[in-house]
Amino acid sequence: MPRSQRNDNFIDKTFTIVADILLRVIPTTQREKEAFTYYRDGMSAQSEGEYAEALQNYYKAMRLEIDPYDRSYILYNIGLIHTSNGEHAKALEYYSQALERNPSLPQAFNNMAVICHYRGEQAIQQGDPETSEAWFDQAAEYWKQAIALAPSNYIEAQNWLKITGRLKEWV
C-alpha cells in the first residue's frame, strides 16, 4: 500500500487529497503522476523520520521525473536527509545538483552555508584556524547568494556576515 494511503497526519492527508485531485484535473502523463507519487511518499516518510524509505522513494522519483525544476526539489530533499544523517559531503553534492537545475533555491544555498559554517567551527575545535577561515569564507559566499535571492530571510546569516566583516566585501 502506498505511504500516501496509510498516512495518519491530518496535514499530510489533506495534501495527499488535494494533490490527487490536481493530478486528475491537470493534464499530466502517467510517468509524471508516478514520479509525483514517489516524491509525495518520500516527503511523507521524511517528515516521519523514515529516511531510508524516503530516499528509496526519492530515487524512484528521480528515475521518472524529467523536469529539471521538479528534479531540483527531489535533489534538495535528498540533501536534507544526508544533512540530517551527518553526511555533509553528500548533502553538499545534492544541494549543488539541485542548484544546477534550479539556481533560485535560496534554502539550498543556506543549507550549504550552514554545513560550511559547521565545518569551520569543527576546524577551530581541532586547532586549525586556516582551514576554519576557508570554511567560513565559503559559508559567507553561500549565504550571500541565499540573501541575494531572499533578502528578507536569513537575518542571522546577515548579522554573522556583518559581525565577521564579510558583509562589506559584498555590499
UniProtKB/Swiss-Prot annotation:
**Keyword Chloroplast recorded:** yes
Family named by the database record: Belongs to the Ycf3 family.
Gene designation: ycf3
Q: Which organism is it from?
A: Angiopteris evecta (Mule's foot fern)
Return the TPR repeat spans. 35-68, 72-105, 120-153
What exactly does this protein do?
A: Essential for the assembly of the photosystem I (PSI) complex. May act as a chaperone-like factor to guide the assembly of the PSI subunits.
Name of the protein in question: Photosystem I assembly protein Ycf3
Its signal peptide is none
Source taxon at top rank? Eukaryota
- Which membrane topology term applies here? Peripheral membrane protein
Q: Does the keyword Repeat apply?
A: yes
A single BP term in Gene Ontology: photosynthesis
Q: What GO cellular component entries does it have?
A: chloroplast thylakoid membrane
* SMART domains noted in UniProt: TPR
Q: Which PANTHER family match?
A: CELLULOSE SYNTHASE OPERON PROTEIN C, TPR REPEAT-CONTAINING PROTEIN MJ0263
Keywords, alphabetical = Chloroplast, Membrane, Photosynthesis, Plastid, Repeat, Thylakoid, TPR repeat
